[in-house]
Amino acid sequence: MLDQPIAQIKGLRVEFQTKDGPVVGVQDVSFDVNPGETVCIVGESGSGKSVSSLSLMRLVEFGGGEITSGQLVFDRREGGQVDLGDTDQALMKQIRGNEIGMIFQEPMTALNPVFTVGRQLTEGLRIHKNMNKAQAEARAIELLREVRIPEPERRMKQYPHELSGGMRQRVVIAMAMACEPRLLIADEPTTALDVTIQAEILALMDRLKRETGTAVMFITHDMAVVAQMADRVVVMFRGNKVEEGTVHEIFENPQHDYTKALLAAVPKLGEMSGKNYPEPMKLMGAEDQKIEPIKGSDEVILNVENLVTRFPVKGGLLRRTVANVHAVEDVSFKVFKGQTLSLVGESGCGKSSAGRSILRLVEPQSGKVEFEGRDILGLNQNELHKARQDMQMIFQDPFASLNPQMQLMDQVAEPMRNYGLASGSELQDRVANLFDRVHLPRSFMRRYPHEMSGGQRQRIAIARALALNPKLIVADEAVSALDVSVQAQVLNLMMELQAELGLSFLFISHDMAVVERVSHQVGVMYLGRIVEIGPRARVFENPQHAYTQALMKAVPIADPNQRKSEKDLNFKPIPSPIHDLNYSPEPSQYMEVAPGHFVLTTDSGY
Amino acid sequence: MTDAAKKDPLQHSSVQQEAEKAPRSQWRDVWDQFKSHRGALSGGILFLIICVGVIFGPLVYWNDAQYVPTGRDFIKLRDMRPIYHALWDPSAKMDWAYPLGTDNLGRDTLSRLMFGGRVSLAVGMAAMVLALLLGSLVGVVAGYFKRLDGLLMRLTDLFLALPLLPMILVAAVLFRESLSKSIGPEGGVFVLIVCLIGITSWMPTARIVRGDVLAIKEREFVLAARSIGTKPDKIISRHILPNVLSPIMVSATLGIATAIITESALSFLGFGFPPDFPTWGRLLNDAVDRMTLFPERVLWPGILISLTVLSVNYLGDGLRDALDPRIRGR
Amino acid sequence: MLTFTIRRLILAVPTLLFISLVIFLLLELAPGDPMAQVPLTVPPEVKEKMRLALGLGEPVHIRFWKWLVQFFWIEPQVLIDNIFGTTFSAGDLRVISWQTRSPVMDIVVQRLPQTLWVVGTAYIVAIVIALPIGIYSAYRQYSWFDQMGTFVSMVGFSVPPFFSGVLVIVIFSVQLGWFPSIYDTTLVVDSWDTFVKQLQQMVMPVMVLALQITAQLSRFMRASMLDNLNQDYVRTARAKGLSEYVVVMVHVLRNSMIPVVTVIALGIPSIFGGAIITEQVFKVNGIGQLLIGAIQANDLPMVQTLTFIFAVLIVLFNLIADVLYGILDPRIRYD
Amino acid sequence: ERGSDGQVNIIYWQAPSILNPFLSGGTKDVEAASLVIEPLARYNSSGEMVPWLAEEIPTTSNGGVSEDLTSITWKLKKGIKWSDGSELTSADVKFTYEYCTHPEGGCAQVTKFEGVTSVETPDDYTVVVTFGAATPFPYGPFVGGESPILQKAQFEQCMGAKAPECTDANFGPIGTGPFVVEEFKPNDVITFVANDQYRDASKPAFSRVLFKGGGDATAAGRAVLETGEFDYAWNLQLAPDVISQMEAAGKGKAVAGFGPLVERLMLNNTNPSPDLGPDERSVVRPHPFLSDPAVYKAMSMAIDRELLVEIGYGKAGKVTCSWVPAPEAYAISPEGCNVQDVAGANAMLDEAGIVDTDGDGIREKDGVPLKVLYQTSTNAVRQDFQALIKQWWSEIGIDAELRNINASVFFGGDPGSPDTFQKFYADVEMYANTFNGTDPQSYFGNGLCDKAPTPASQWQGENISRFCDEEFDALHAELSGTADMAKRVEIGQKLNTIIFEKGGMIPLVHRGRLSAHANTLGGVDLNVWDSELWNIADWHRAE
Ligand SMILES: Nc1ncnc2c1ncn2[C@@H]1O[C@H](COP(=O)(O)OP(=O)(O)OP(=O)(O)O)[C@@H](O)[C@H]1O
Ligand SMILES: Nc1ncnc2c1ncn2[C@@H]1O[C@H](COP(=O)(O)OP(=O)(O)OP(=O)(O)O)[C@@H](O)[C@H]1O
Ligand SMILES: [Mg+2]
Ligand SMILES: [Mg+2]
């Protein structure tokens, strides 16, 4: 009984009926999940990971899919094995949530916004375990405690939007675990989360698995997470399983080209130690790649001093400002020509606000932003319009930052049109050149954003930013939403452009490994302030501030030998950045621990 | 797995393959998508037939819509039944020269339907377009410029509260004379009616558009547009308007129906076109009294109004899908 | 939320005052004469005297001011008097209708029950019919049921009530003789028989009105359901092992109702506004008929008062819709 | 026997808004009130005067009217009780006079008391009305449905400016009639119950009346003739084929009666050109071409009146060329009135040199094309007439532009509106008019030169055609001084002829009033000279 797999997927094939005929989601996928084991399924976006897991729950049918062949043998708690592929929905209802639990990718949308956490948690319990309301609530509170949510009684009465992303994901986990399923399917449970929260969630799942003996099917595209979690790994590529093996086999001795490429694309924290300058990654399949460090210059292109950005919180009958969100608080840094300064920190610490303040996409409260000696904050609208020609921005979400209704050509041409830089066939040529620059075929010019993959889309965003020949690009989480492989390409592209054009980047990210790869300088932000700033090598190899140290610890490393355990982690929830009007924060003071390496000495709230 | 994929596993080879295809023209795409929408296609064809019928019908059809037979003809030609009536009542009064029969004054029903269709369709479309323009303008401005939001929304309240009839009376007093002097009596009434229906029906569109604009304004691509130096007017026209097209299309389809019906109610109350100027609404309305005696006289205009609304609705559905590149790609 | 409500209420006052002014000026500008229905046999001098007796001789701003005082100061007193038996308003001149020479508010109060009964029932019936249709059409999108629903609602939307009303009268009253063609406003429901009678006379107007409202509401419901059916949380709910019924009728419906409820709330003023043509066709003689009658007779105080009450309701229900939105959707917080 | 026949249901498609005819004057209000309050004398269905609350009709021969025609003495019947039990006295009659003539009251029926200098009450049952001048027809005050007697006790506090405040009294007047108001819902429905103080103990046969208002004529007709929900429907202005189809249901029948109501085309004798200033438009005579007898005569000849009657009114219409077709004696019948003569009309125009010079099918007179703007109120029958007449005129080379205007604007006298029938900013307009009672003298006055509406008179005035003819004015003056009936009729016929021949108007149809009653309703005697419900006390259920 014990060595019998809990779930066996044999020759699964799923098709979707679309307007243009059937589309194959996965074809001929087989693998087993054994009791007490974590099987990680990796692969790029669209490779069929979700479809496989949804098939196991028989939820593909609700998305228009159909299991056309294959068996999904599941070992029930009682009653032996059944083929989930042809059970009826009535029986499936009993299995779902009860014997198989599922955690979904997006904690923001996976919970019903209009029901309380308590209600959503108890629902499954009441159906499957026949509990009454009180019992179910008691159990739910217990579950919340298990997933380490503070004040579980209060959370029960809250709505999802009142919880942070991490807490929401824990609620989803608690929900999936509620009936103590034999199999837990986790579909990218941490992709959308901050490193720190990700680390906690991973550790939590690991612990729960060990405590309850549940088998876990873990879906992700992040190799670092795989290294952290997996016992066995299944690699998928375009609807097929291409490789399967234990985590060590996969990481140490990958067989399939795709797996190798995938591993090569993962930036690993610590890879850059000993190097002073960032350099492009070595990727599979790109033969004539020249890997050279990018030096840049010492010339200051952007000088930010004591930047403060606050957002008013309005209230009362007259809608007067009653408080302020202190998004950016006394931040100073310099960006050098041809170099990259990275800002890292957790969600909500003010990274984006800082980036936007520099371009005056949000109006800063006070401070100084000097770009090539010009004071940006003092410009009027017309001058600002001109100044923006030299400063561009790339946004986090390649899906959201392109207008879905415009052809790519027009989107790339738009900045040039706005500034009247070119028109007619000249404009066409320049757009075509930009497409070449970002390695997109010119035939894509007439496409629409949805016809592109995320990586391609982000390249369009880069092309658009390059259109005006800017000197500085603010890249706000420019690669966070991308698959590892694509991310690596985009990063290389950015570095290539930097080397060729001498661009300066203000690179905003929460991914320490990526930051390590691309930066010359690194600033760590916490609650609106920079707590530590300095050359990348120093900050990463010798973190001084307590927060930086904690952050470094949380980063999973794509190496199964360097797993982290829950007790290593130590995060306090970020205090609220909202203060009332007469709150005056003290100025930031720094100590220079090494040349160019500063650490905040005043209280940062951490 | 293909060879190409093996050699370069990180490239999206499917995308690569597609890239080799010749670039497609945008309108070609729109048309392709539109064609594949069965409802839209039939709606479009139906609408086209109706339009062609009312525009060219009177040119080729032998009877004149306004001609009233006189003398002895009158008694002979009035109250003629449609020819299909012969199927169940061969003794009924009918004539192949009057395929749908005549009314109580001997005017030919088919030509009145065609002529009336011209007016109804023109009023419906023009009023709808006006209402859409107004509604979208107010909605976009209110949604985009926070400062004007409150003011414009209260303005919407005001218009919702205004009674239509007195407004029509006022407008007639103020503008009818001058309009009919410059563009003739029918033209003047047309402009008046279109303006009035437009002015009194833009509010729902404005509300919906405003809501959507508020949401779209927060999307990143608007911020991105700002960062590449796009001026607000261009942001609205390039980035916001195309993305609120779909609710506007829905309002448009409903707008045509309301406009056609409102026009008929206006004729009914005596504020519409000159009495010898048939419109579908008026035909329907005039025939209601004799509904049991001559059911065809209510049925035909009724069916035509419904068919128009229905076809426009499906057409709108299809157009909305076709104009949305996201759906088009699927 | 409370401050939001209060702020909007305060804002509503100038808005409404402005609206009342616009309405007044509009009516003032509109041609027409309260004497239009007096027969031609009554000579013009007499009509002129009658006009003066109605107060038409006074300048516009004085009449507006008088109306404001009567509506905002005296009528509330009358209301208080009626409730508590006090005599604040004794001797004050109320808003008087030119047609009937009686206080406008009295007539409105008299008319309201009919309208609320008929239009209100139609509204409820429409909601009761439209929601399931919308839900099912969305759940089985592009099924034949959905296609039929689209078709029927479009037809319902495009058939004017002066046609559908007469049609049902011809069928059900004239041919079949099931229902009365004329609504009896004097009927007092105090027994089973009278209740049945009331039902009978309400069937047809309710049917005609409900057809139109159903057509629109079901479209709305369908669209809203479609939006929500593809949301991630629906998958979560299914993954919990909930039955389809609970998933659709609890999880999806609750979310889909948010916009629909506000649409319903926005439509409520039209209940009070009555349904002009339908009321006329069935002789329900509610507020809608009162308004059209008053417009035709140029009874300005009546028209002004009715439209203004209507405006108040519109502004109020706009506010209510916004507040409802905030209540139904826990994510929305008005600060 | 009183109250034995249960309830009678009456439907008026115009709903009464008040039951005090002095404050409204609308036919619907007057007729609804006639169930409750009554005059001293009424006209019966043949237009003869019958005593009602009075003992007899005062005449010169019975001494009731003074020889010099300046006073009339009414004797009240004795023992008539108000519905509250008190007795009707001459004080009530006098009060009614005072009530209506109060300067601030805005009484709609004040013309009834025109010329009256005093009303005296020598005793409780005698009323003496004195006129300032000899009045050959002294039966204006207190005669007919428009001039009923109000109870002094009830209305005493409601004089003048206070009139509108007495809502209870205006909605529920105490009367002497067969019914008493039970509930009045303005513009909607009235319920009446039999008056137990009514002077005839066996009447009324019905114990209740449900008087419903609102809707449209079709629905009212349907309710009586097709569904049988109602017993009596008033004034069904419907096309004859519609009526006969309804009658076919067999539930009731339509009855017609003829008063002096005439549907006519008014010819504008002034120039309505929009190019003229506001003080000249429709003020200065003559009209560019309508003043030519050939034109208006041809226009009249081109019309097929018989067809119009058949299409529009059926048995409720008669062909006429008289402005005043009733009482019959006044009517004229010029030759060719009932036949259409398009050829003759064309010949007449050709002869007058009004020919089509530019080949567009429209004749020109002195270079002015005969294009007329033809307006009327919104009403299905009138629109049919417009279409027909337009076609006929087009056959004699006259082009008509049609316009219909909402009745409340058209008949409303708003000086600010360009669309009122008084302003007459058109060449031809069509409507119907009539007069009360049987004496046309003051109605004929509507053709006098000085009654033309002008900006100076705020566009008030009854001479809508702006007709002006010395001979007419002189004849009318003679009529005012003549008491002899035969002589009056003779002058009246002359006036009728002048207005027709000299282009004041083109009378089209003598319209009757068409009402419908259920087959089970007995006693209906359609009366066009007074309230249709004048004899409701005699109505009863018939098998
Ligand atoms: N409802 C659907 N209709 C049509 N095709 C679908 C549908 N859902 C998935 N697919 C297709 O199935 C394939 C596999 O999709 P799947 O969602 O499993 O990818 P994934 O590996 O989970 O990607 P991601 O990392 O982006 O979640 C894709 O090519 C996708 O286009
Ligand atoms: N427009 C705004 N109005 C009010 N508050 C805002 C606004 N934009 C950001 N904030 C607040 O300012 C703080 C900093 O936000 P910011 O977006 O800069 O964080 P971030 O570090 O970029 O986070 P993330 O990684 O999630 O993008 C947050 O508390 C956020 O809620
Ligand atoms: Mg997935
Ligand atoms: Mg951010």
Predicted features and spans:
Chain B
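Gly/Trp-centered helix-boundary motif
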Residues: 1-136, 147, 236, 259-260, ...
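Generic hydrophobic transmembrane alpha-helix motif, especially the helices
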Residues: 99, 130-144, 151-214, 219, ...
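Amphipathic cytosolic juxtamembrane alpha-helices at the membrane-cytosol interface
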Residues: 107-122, 126, 146-153, 206, ...
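Conserved G/P- and acidic residue-centered "switch" motifs that form tight phosphate/ATP-binding loops
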Residues: 135, 139, 229, 242-244, ...
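Helix-loop interface residues and adjacent transmembrane-helix termini in multi-pass membrane transporters
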Residues: 144-145, 187, 253, 268, ...
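Non-cytoplasmic
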Residues: 166-170, 174, 194, 248-282
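Alpha-helical transmembrane segments
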Residues: 198, 202, 206, 255, ...
